[in-house]
Amino acid sequence: MSMESKLLDSRIKTRSVKNSEKWLGYLLGPAGALLLNAVLATYLNVYYTDVLNLTGLWGGMFLMIFPIASKIIDAITNVIMGYIIDHTKTKQGKARPWLLLSAPLLTISGILLFTVPMENEKVMVWWVMISYNLFYSFSYTIYNMSHNLMVPLSTRNTKERGGLSVFNQIATIMITGILVAMIFPMVIMPMIGVDRSKWISLMSILSLLALPLTLLEYYFTKERVTEETIGEEKKEIPFSTQLKIVFTDKYTLIIFVYFLIFTFGTTFKNLGLVYYCNYVLGSYNDGITQTLVSVIGGIPMGIGIFAVWPIAKKIGKRNATMYGFVLYALGGVICSIAPRNMAVVLIGQFIKNIGGLPCSYVFMALFADVLDHIEWKSGIRCDGTAMSIYNIIAVALVGICTGLFNMMLAHSGYIAPSIDSLGKTIAAAQPQSVLNAITFSFVGMEVITAILLVFLLRFLNVEKTIELKQEEIFRIRKEEAEKEGKIYKDPETVAREESEKEEIRTREIKLEELKDKCDKNGWNYEEKKAEFIKSEEAKKKAEREKQLNNEKKAKAKEGVKKAKVRAKYDLLPAEKKKAIKEKEMKKQKDLEAFWEKEKKEGTAYRNFVKAKLEMKDIKNESL
């Protein structure tokens, strides 16, 4: 069936986002694939070690090598899939067609992951490798990359886009925070134990559920942005050039090493969670230990967003993240003191997760600063290239960590559970070497990575001059626009004008829809139009008043704050005032010297990149 077929058309016909799109396309639709992936991320390795008993296969080397090799393939397919989506042009958009394809692939590959033949070892090995790569390297890669693009491609209206993003986030939190973190360890896992037939039944149900829900996401989403850009052609910077720019910048390298170390520790912790709760802190699938660790340890993540940004604004994003990792390490040390004591571990996990708040909420903002720095330095935005590397690190490390974790289990003597004659799961008493390996994975590894990150972040000074660099970017853009005889507008003005245009367009669309509704129901359009306009104006007036009140409150609050600081300063002795003034002057002088050095290096590099690109253009024209 061609993508031009009306049967494949989106059920969303409006230019503005409707409730059906939010609830069905962005909340309920993604739930199937997200649930399947979240369960696999937590329990697939448990299935391999405890149900299929693959820990000792090939002397423990199989579960070490195959995840690493598979994730290398996964990393490659991520890059290829990104390229394919960018070059897909159909009536249904560029991402939605791949959502449609992923629906049956997720179901088939999800079932194949668990229906592993046990009779022949060679067949079993090949089945595990092929099914794993079919799901992660193809099915889920196709789904995830197209799914992640749906919000950006849905609309240009920032309010509507923000609303869709919230619904998407609710779907993720609902799945991972409630179903997988609470329901599964409390109810489902104690029921299925290590009974292979029950695992197959459960995962087949989840895989089958992904099919209709992913189709729901396909039919109740719409790529409005793609529809607007059909036919446009843009001059592209060579990927090799962007790659050189990214890998020759110190801040980019620091942020990638940061992400690599952080992901390494986090992945080990996530892999060790189930085993730690089953053998060290609690008993096998006791239904409560894992839930307590996940929920109590995760409470700060829910409330922390209200505290993190005020702190980050006051002391800086880098500093907030760095000090957070000090708490992160402290929490891990507390857990290590008594890893079998529930109260001690929960306290340690709570402190640890408070420390982890800045890196969870602030990292992408720091990453954005680095991307702005790259643009200032080279004159080129390298967002896509940088994000590709970011994704490759994330994907590859999951495989590497899984392989290393399984090697630790195998070489420390891990004993898989068994089923007795009554079908009850019997957990083996693990040797101390296994308990030590599991405890190190869940608790100890992140203590080491947190300390390394505190040291590494000391060198990430991108915030120091980022505002000056952003001003420089705008100045350069203005000069380039004037050379071409164009009028330059700053980003705030452009954003405001685009927002105003979008509001007018949205209003016109709503009026058209209202007219159709009036014609259909025999209503008086002029009366309904007057009511609509009156309602919209009342909403705008209320929003303006609210904004003005908020601005007044913020201004008054800032005034009180400054007055308190000034009063406190006035009470200081003259010597102290002098010392503070000298310190501020030195800080300003150091900043100016730092900026001048950076500015000189940045200008030279930007001119170098520009000259290289011009040479390539001349060479291409001559060909």
Residue map of PLM features:
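Long, low-complexity, intrinsically disordered cytosolic termini of multi-pass membrane proteins
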Residues: 1-2, 477-623
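Membrane-embedded alpha-helical bundles of multi-pass transporters/translocases
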Residues: 2-490, 522, 564-566, 591-623
